[in-house]
């Protein structure tokens, strides 16, 4: 039975196996009530503004995390293509920060006055722990893939046919829900699967725990944005 499970994992990839295993939590992160409220057009403006301001702070903390993953790829990866994928993602973060500033201005948010809420601090703390030289590349790239994929899956749901996403939020949803970003997430997933296929049992355990931690932090971040913390 165990050999059959291992064969399936090899065929479909470890990340797919884990998402299947932890589907309830994954759905909680990608189909959160906040996302559903965007999709059906009932979102509270205050919730969106809270998310926007807090996510700006998160992205600023995300930059050094991605830089650390790039360094780990340089040191530990057996494929030079990894660095190119990660570097491409890192380069897009400058534009992302500019977008947040423009969007905040549009919504009347003074970003210099924004203070990180506890859920945000906790999530940024997780990123910081992954920046340690002791954190394995396999674990860090699994987290990176999961973080990006939750946003892609969530916001893609808001621009699917039949959605009633408010026009003023369409740009936000397209930013992460578009097909190109989906392909980028697929590239990260391919890297993660390759690393996990060669990982030790201990690394696999750490990576799975990290995936669960990312999903839990994503749910808490959405909860924070809705005000129910």
Swiss-Prot record:
Q: What is its EC number?
A: 3.5.1.-, 3.5.99.2
Q: Which GO terms describe its cellular component?
A: cytosol
Which keywords fit this entry according to its UniProt record?
Answer: Disulfide bond, Hydrolase, Thiamine biosynthesis
| This protein's pathway | Cofactor biosynthesis; thiamine diphosphate biosynthesis
Any one Gene Ontology molecular-function term assigned to this protein's record: thiaminase activity
* Catalytic reaction list: 4-amino-5-aminomethyl-2-methylpyrimidine + H2O = 4-amino-5-hydroxymethyl-2-methylpyrimidine + NH4(+); N-formyl-4-amino-5-aminomethyl-2-methylpyrimidine + H2O = 4-amino-5-aminomethyl-2-methylpyrimidine + formate
Please name the InterPro entries in this protein's record: Haem_Oase-like_multi-hlx (IPR016084), Thiaminase-2/PQQC (IPR004305), Thiamine_Salvage_TenA (IPR050967)
Query: Is Lyase one of the keywords?
Result: no
Q: Which cysteines are joined by disulfide bonds?
A: 158-173
Sorted alphabetically, the Gene Ontology BP terms of this entry are:
thiamine biosynthetic process; thiamine diphosphate biosynthetic process
Broad enzyme group: hydrolase
User: What is the purpose of this protein?
Assistant: May be involved in thiamine salvage.
Q: Which family does it belong to?
A: Belongs to the thiaminase-2 family.
Descriptive protein name: Probable bifunctional TENA-E protein
- What organism is recorded for this protein? Glycine max
Protein encoded by which gene: TENA_E
């Amino acid at each position: 039975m165990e050999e059959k499970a291992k064969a399936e994992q090899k065929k479909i990839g470890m990340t797919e196996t884990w998402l299947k295993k932890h589907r309830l939590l994954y759905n909680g992160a990608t189909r959160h009530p906040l996302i559903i409220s965007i999709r059906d057009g009932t979102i509270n403006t205050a919730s969106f503004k809270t998310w926007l301001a807090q996510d700006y702070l998160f992205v600023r903390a995300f930059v050094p995390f991605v830089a650390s993953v790039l360094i780990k790829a340089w040191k530990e990866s057996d494929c030079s293509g990894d660095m190119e994928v990660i570097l491409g993602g890192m380069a897009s973060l400058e534009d992302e920060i500019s977008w947040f500033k423009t969007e905040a201005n549009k919504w009347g948010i003074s970003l210099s006055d924004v203070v990180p809420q506890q859920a945000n601090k906790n999530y940024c703390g997780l990123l910081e722990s992954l920046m340690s030289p002791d954190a394995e590349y396999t674990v860090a790239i699994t987290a990176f893939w999961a973080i990006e994929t939750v946003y892609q899956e969530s916001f893609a749901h808001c621009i699917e046919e039949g959605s009633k996403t408010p026009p003023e939020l369409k740009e936000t949803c397209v930013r992460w829900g578009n097909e190109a970003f989906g392909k980028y997430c697929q590239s990260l997933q391919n890297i993660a699967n390759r690393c996990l296929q060669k990982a030790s049992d201990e690394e696999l355990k750490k990576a799975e725990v990290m995936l669960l931690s990312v999903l839990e932090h994503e749910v808490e971040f959405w909860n924070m944005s809705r005000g129910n913390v």
